[in-house]
Amino acid sequence: MATDSWALAVDEQEAAVKSMTNLQIKEEKVKADTNGIIKTSTTAEKTDEEEKEDRAAQSLLNKLIRSNLVDNTNQVEVLQRDPNSPLYSVKSFEELRLKPQLLQGVYAMGFNRPSKIQENALPMMLAEPPQNLIAQSQSGTGKTAAFVLAMLSRVEPSDRYPQCLCLSPTYELALQTGKVIEQMGKFYPELKLAYAVRGNKLERGQKISEQIVIGTPGTVLDWCSKLKFIDPKKIKVFVLDEADVMIATQGHQDQSIRIQRMLPRNCQMLLFSATFEDSVWKFAQKVVPDPNVIKLKREEETLDTIKQYYVLCSSRDEKFQALCNLYGAITIAQAMIFCHTRKTASWLAAELSKEGHQVALLSGEMMVEQRAAVIERFREGKEKVLVTTNVCARGIDVEQVSVVINFDLPVDKDGNPDNETYLHRIGRTGRFGKRGLAVNMVDSKHSMNILNRIQEHFNKKIERLDTDDLDEIEKIAN
């Protein structure tokens, strides 16, 4: 695979991430010795809503922290455009009759057999004549490798012009996809890759000879229309990745539709999204005519394996004391503690450090790569406590997490219970068939009301726990 300056940027990005994982993140001193604390500026209290991370950053974070595919047990639902055509899935990559150099690339990446989404999507994407596809797939399910394989399979290496076009919401996400193209195509040196991203300056009137172009909607639109670097009528495969992230960004939706309208009728359209809410579905139907559809039926998250308690407190300091009592009485392998604001999270991490706990702090102010490094350290057990705001409520599976503590209960911007976030938060424990423990700190009439409404929503009783009673705490550990 060619390595122009933008391809090199991919390697640099990867190297930066690797070095970040080994980085001892320097902490500001919080008085004595604060083990593993990353002190963040807290000039003003941030509300939970402000703290909610933008989707692109969350998506990038998920890519950086995934070392392997998610073991997904969800059922795949396939809706075919033509219900009379035979439906089949594959259990091995050999069944797809790939070009030998592509099969070699797939195996070199560590894929031994297709993932659940690949089993169903690849036969559709590689079918003749080409078929359009809308697919729902979370991070870590192998969907990037699937559409990259489809693009590489359609390319005619002897034709030196763009034949496959892939849109990503951000420069960083484009680089991540580019990295997969580089890896899978490394035994196919005739294939070249170009990045249509802001900052990649080309001479006006210049024609691109690379067969695959990956970029962000605004730049790709310029390259197709204004600058004429790409002849859209020669594009065979159009991929729109992370559609849910794309439509959350001002202007990207319209730009993507304008690009799609320039493409030939027989161009294969592939769209991927982690979620399928109405806005994404409407957008998908505008850009992908006559599609096959693959949906991952979401596994119902359950509270059945999680013991839930609440602790009555009257102040922040009392909540902290209750936390210390809990730690003093039971053995906790690893814990995640959720706070409402960055300021509280920073304060709590510092206080826990003073008590001698190995603490990591995760906050929206940190760079995505920094966050990935913190999560990796926690996953490796270098820190036993992860204090975080909502930034990290989803997508992080750490097998050793046995306790989740809601230092503050999750509420939406209107102050109502955020039931979905509650479920995702305490779902960090009780995974992998183990029993988990969730403890909720309640410090006011308002938070008691929130807790009662959460109980009603899930139809699950949350028991009161007296953290001053050592015997009672020891009982919950058994």
UniProtKB/Swiss-Prot annotation:
May I have one GO cellular component term?
Answer: nucleoplasm
Residues forming the motif Q motif are 91-119
Q: Where is this region: C-terminal lobe?
A: 300-478
Which residue ranges does the record annotate as region N-terminal lobe?
Answer: 2-299
Cell location:
Cytoplasm; Nucleus, Nucleoplasm
Q: Which GO terms describe its molecular function?
A: ATP binding; ATP hydrolysis activity; mRNA binding; RNA helicase activity
What positions carry the motif DEAD box?
241-244
PTM-bearing positions, type Phosphothreonine: T42
Q: One Pfam family for this entry, by name?
A: Helicase_C
Q: Which SUPFAM superfamilies match?
A: P-loop containing nucleoside triphosphate hydrolases (SSF52540)
Where the record annotates domain Helicase C-terminal, the positions are: 305-473
Q: At the top level of its lineage, which domain of life is listed? A: Eukaryota
Q: What is known of its domains?
A: The N-terminal extension helix acts as an autoinhibitory domain, preventing ATP hydrolysis, unless the N-terminus of the protein is displaced by RNA binding, allowing cleft closure to bring key side chains into position for catalysis.
Name this polypeptide is given: ATP-dependent RNA helicase DDX19A
Q: State the species of origin.
A: Homo sapiens (Human)
Lineage of the species this protein comes from: Eukaryota, Metazoa, Chordata, Craniata, Vertebrata
